[in-house]
Amino acid sequence: MEQLTNNSIIWAAGENSGDYLASRVLPAVAASRPNLKMEGIGGNRMIQDGLDPWFHASELSVRGYLEVIRHLPRILKIRREMMRRTVQLRPAAYIGVDAPDFNLSIEEKVRASGIPVVHMVAPAVWAWRPQRIHQIKRAVDHLLLIFP
């Protein structure tokens, strides 16, 4: 297996709430390992905290079926680019923040390539989409919860 780099962590926060949550964690991670480069998808808060953005979170922030359909080609292109760049870069870790419909497929491919995966904000499985638990098991090494 290829060696992982120790100098980058890839973040993917594609919503305003994810940008906020990640901005509460990213500075602590960066302070604990000053040599780490933080890069990926984030919003203004994460960028202010040192994220080198590949894409801005606003490019993924869509609501309603029609808006999703209209922006779907761009969203899928961003997803493919995140997978490609992450696997090629071999970062120390990939951290997906919420947005499970976007992140879980990326996380599954990234983890299969041997890169450790953390997912912040556990996706709902109890109320609906209970089958999602199987994808989470395949995709994620560590799942961070915001509620007990």
Regions found by a protein language model. Name each.
Residues S8-P148:
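Active-site and donor-binding regions of nucleotide-sugar-utilizing enzymes
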Residues L4-N6:
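Phosphate-coordination loops involved in phosphoryl transfer and adenosine-cofactor binding
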